[in-house]
Structures are given as C-alpha cells and as structure tokens.
Amino acid sequence: MYNEIFGIASFIVTFALMVLMYRCFGKQGLIAWVAIGTIIANIQVIKAVHIFGITATLGNVMFASIYLATDILNDIYGRKVAKRAVWLGFSSTLVMIIVMQMSLHFIPAPVDNAQNSLKMIFDLVPRIAIGSIIAYIIGQHIDVFIFSMIKKIFSSDKTFFIRAYGSTILSSIIDTGLFVSIAFIGTMPGTAVFEIF
C-alpha cells in the first residue's frame, strides 16, 4: 500500500512541478522541463517497483509529464517548438550518458566512496540506453504528430485535454512497447517483461 500512496503523491508532485516551471518561466520553462525530465526519467527507469499489483519501472510519471509539456508547447507555440523540445530532450540525455560514462572511467581516489554507486546507476547496459533513446525519439515525434492531427478536428481551447490525452495515450503505448522490447526482451522472464509493459 505504501508504493501506491507514494506513487499517487509522486504523480501530483511531478505534475505540480511541471506547472510551476511553466508558470514561472513560460515556454522556456516547459522546454527546460523536457530536458530535465528526460534525464530524470532515464535514471528512474533503472528501478523496478511493485505497484498496483504489477511490476513497473519508475520513470513513467515523469515521461507522462514530458508528453504533456510537449503537447502544451505544440498547442500554444506550434509543432516546430514542440519538435525542438523533443530534440533538446534527446540531446540532454545523450550528453548525460556521454559525460557520466566518461566520469566512470576516472580512477577514483583511495578515499572515494562514490564510484561503486555511480557505476551501479550510470554504467548503463547499452540495450537500456539504446532502447530509451529510440523509444523517446519515436514516441515523442508520434505524440507531436498525433496531437497536431487531433487538433485539426478538436481545435477549441476546451478540447485541449482530448488532444493531450489522445496523443499521449497512443504515443506512450508505442514508447513503452519499443523501450521494453529493446531493453528487456531476452534479459528477464516474459511475464516480467509483460508486466513492465
């Protein structure tokens, strides 16, 4: 029950922080949220938890907030700005992976206590990193595209949530399916992979 309560709290806090970034910094706040959120979600996805009767990786809530941020950018500032935010999220993840991999190759000082912990978190299995990057790019571009298509049908301000939820649900399913397939198939039992999906 703890994970469920904490999961709901995490959901509320994550989306409240995204709204706060938007309120304080406008368009730039949402673009920054995409970059920050992508890095956070790619670190969170390493941890598996049991929640609501299933095994899931963390990062799903953060990724959902990223989808909403790109939907808001797409709705208010246009598809071009949303796509730039997607590429910024990809670039920030790539920079994080490269810099942290380089950091791991330094020989630690005899008094260092961080190397093993950093190695455990950032010595990403190539499949996970590749799966994450491929799923992110494809999922986000599909989200931006679907949102734009739905907006042609439901264009009023009152129908934003139809556009946002419609595009996010479809693109999240594709994103998760791609990520789980690339990162985990063949590395864990099929039932565990199915639960994560």
Regions from the language model: what does each represent?
Residues 1-73, 80:
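Hydrophobic transmembrane alpha-helices
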Residues 150-162:
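Membrane interface segments of multi-pass transport proteins and intramembrane proteases
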Residues 43-53, 76, 98-111:
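Transmembrane alpha-helix boundary signature
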Residues 102-127:
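Membrane-interface interhelical connector segments
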Residues 87, 91-111, 132, 136-140:
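Transmembrane alpha-helix/helix-exit interface in multi-pass inner-membrane proteins
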Residues 8-9, 31-32, 61-64, 86, ...:
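Hydrophobic alpha-helical transmembrane segments
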